[in-house]
Amino acid sequence: MKSDTIAAIATAPGRGGVGVIRISGSNLLPFAFALTEKTPKPRYASLADFKAADGSTIDTGLLLYFPNPQSFTGEDVLELQGHGGPVVMQMLLARCLDLGARLAEPGEFSRRAFLNGKMDLAQAEAVADLIDAATASAARSAVRSLQGEFSRAIGELNDELINLRMLVEATLDFPEEDIDFLKAANAFGRLERLQLKLAEIFDRAGQGKLLQSGLHVVLAGQPNVGKSSLLNRLAGDDLAIVTPIAGTTRDALRSTIQIEGIPLHIIDTAGLRETDDEVEKIGIERSWKEIERSDVVLLLVDARTGVSESDREILARLPDRLQRITVYNKIDLTHRAAERHDEANGTAISLSAKANQGIELLRQELLRIAGWHQAEDVFIARERHLRALSAAQEHVAAARNVVEGALPALELFAEELRLAQQSLGEITGEFTADDLLGVIFSRFCIGK
């Protein structure tokens, strides 16, 4: 890790009442004196003139000094709070660079905080997630992760894995003892509880990812069932051409909307049917690719005819992991009322895109799937967190299979537990390659 002095503007670009420059390094008292002709008192805001090399005043503002290790980065930290004009901020930053600091790389302050043990990797990522939060729910979830709630949950799982590994090591180290350590400690029951806890955290993390990045929703179904009309209704604009001619939509149309601040990335696809039209065939192939990448599929059917055999074939082909909502459209042409109910294949909603009936029911169902109503329980998570949790689940399941075997192979059991622990360690940064750290922190703001 580089240990030189770094500096960056920590406030957003543009004009503002206050601008902040953050500086981090070792032994910054001489730096502060050269800049202000004052020796700052730790953790006090001091009024100071920020001096240029010729002794003239660049700006007057507040100087704050946080000595190591009680600072954000774990190093000495200075914060210069001046007037928020872009010119004066650049002049003040240039003076800091003249005094020996270099311009911080994106995320370098947070990276130093991580490497100095001030926060783990999940907490460091939560800093960026809090900055990027598009909704109050996402912001609150990011704060919980920043305060260590997600990390503590991972830590509890890690502790249980360590305890189980200790039992295995005891059995391997004392083979002459007539004691079945795994049976005596109820290893099977503990693995079962560990699996349940892993599944719970995976679900909460998955909901948090949706809360932050939004749902990818695909409108699917046979031609001329109202997919484009529903897209236009949800988007509040005429994005798609709507005609009574089947097969009007040949390629995917995309729109991003927000419901209660939750991003919804909606894709209207070509009607799914057998066709000899080569252009339409390409559109249908792309439709299935969009479905495979989505979080939710809205299968639209004509409320007048109900679910057809072709619709059942579409349902059967949908990936099991997908949330699915069967949408009975065109209820304005029937005696059916707008409603939500459960079916064997998932949730069903009766509505009319054309007459704007039942649209709010669909919006609320999408919010439910996105975790909006359970926002206080979710963790803001990233795709890499979900991959690591999934890998840990696989290794714990493999360990359980070993225990259930007629002749348990203790070495294999221990190895699966070790791999599960390593997967969890990737979340908090205990087992993380340097190149991955570079990718993660490069996506941060310069001043973070």
UniProtKB/Swiss-Prot annotation:
Domain TrmE-type G: from-to ranges: 214-371
Gene3D superfamilies assigned to the protein according to its UniProt record, in alphabetical order: P-loop containing nucleotide triphosphate hydrolases, Probable tRNA modification gtpase trme, domain 1, tRNA modification GTPase MnmE domain 2
GO terms, molecular function: GTP binding; GTPase activity; metal ion binding
Binding site for GTP: 224-229, 243-249, 268-271
Keywords for the protein's UniProt record, in alphabetical order: Cytoplasm, GTP-binding, Hydrolase, Magnesium, Metal-binding, Nucleotide-binding, Potassium, tRNA processing
Cofactor(s) in the UniProt record: K(+)
GO biological process: tRNA methylation; tRNA wobble uridine modification
Pfam families: MMR_HSR1, MnmE_helical, TrmE_N
CDD domains for this protein: trmE, TrmE_N
GO CC terms, sorted: cytosol
Cofactor note: Binds 1 potassium ion per subunit.
Protein location: Cytoplasm
Binding residues for K(+): 224, 243, 245, 248
Matching PROSITE patterns: G_TRME
Keyword tRNA processing included in the entry's annotation: yes
EC number of the protein: 3.6.-.-
Binding site for Mg(2+): 228, 249
Complexes and interactors: Homodimer. Heterotetramer of two MnmE and two MnmG subunits.
Family statement drawn from the similarity comment of this UniProt entry: Belongs to the TRAFAC class TrmE-Era-EngA-EngB-Septin-like GTPase superfamily. TrmE GTPase family.
Cited function: Exhibits a very high intrinsic GTPase hydrolysis rate. Involved in the addition of a carboxymethylaminomethyl (cmnm) group at the wobble position (U34) of certain tRNAs, forming tRNA-cmnm(5)s(2)U34.
Protein name: tRNA modification GTPase MnmE
Gene that this sequence comes from: mnmE
